[in-house]
Amino acid sequence: SCIWQSNARGVDINHNFPANWEEIHKREIASGISAPHNTRYGGKTPSSEPETISLMNYCIKQNFSRCYAFHSQGREIYYTFGDETPKDSKTMARLLARTCNYKLSTPPSIADGGGFKDWFIHRFNKPGFTFEIGKGENPLPLSDLEEEYKILQNILCLGAVV
């Protein structure tokens, strides 16, 4: 069986945002992903999917101070976007990591760009964080979600005051 991480059109929404999309698209092709796929296909163009456009428009209207994206798995936090990483991001990421006992990491090169967090940082020059929740295999077993939620409650509370 394969893990499906894409929308119904075979586009991985977290590879469809206009933030270094061209570079990640080249990496997808080099990895053999050049058409709709169960994972990591960023579409024919950036922002080609209605889900991507909706999330972008929502963030523009809300003027958030930071973004949190939740994925699975690895119990790690991604917070960088190349040279565009906001200066206070590392301090915030360290605090978040200590709060939930996650490690700070860098995404694999095929996933370094084109994502929601990447676009948020690029568009607003504000901190963005991707939390890879849980430990084990994808999909994360439903039985693990309650424990992960308890861990992440502290993050959500901290985010309200920091």
What positions do the PLM features span?
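His/Asp/Glu-rich mid-to-C-terminal helical/loop segments that flank catalytic regions of hydrolases
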Residues: 137-162
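Conserved active-site loop/cleft motifs that coordinate metal ions or position small ligands
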Residues: 69, 106-108, 128-133
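Active-site/substrate-binding loop(s) of hydrolase catalytic cores
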Residues: 1-87, 94, 99, 134, ...
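Short amphipathic alpha-helix initiation/capping segments at coil-to-helix junctions
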Residues: 48, 85-89, 109-113, 145
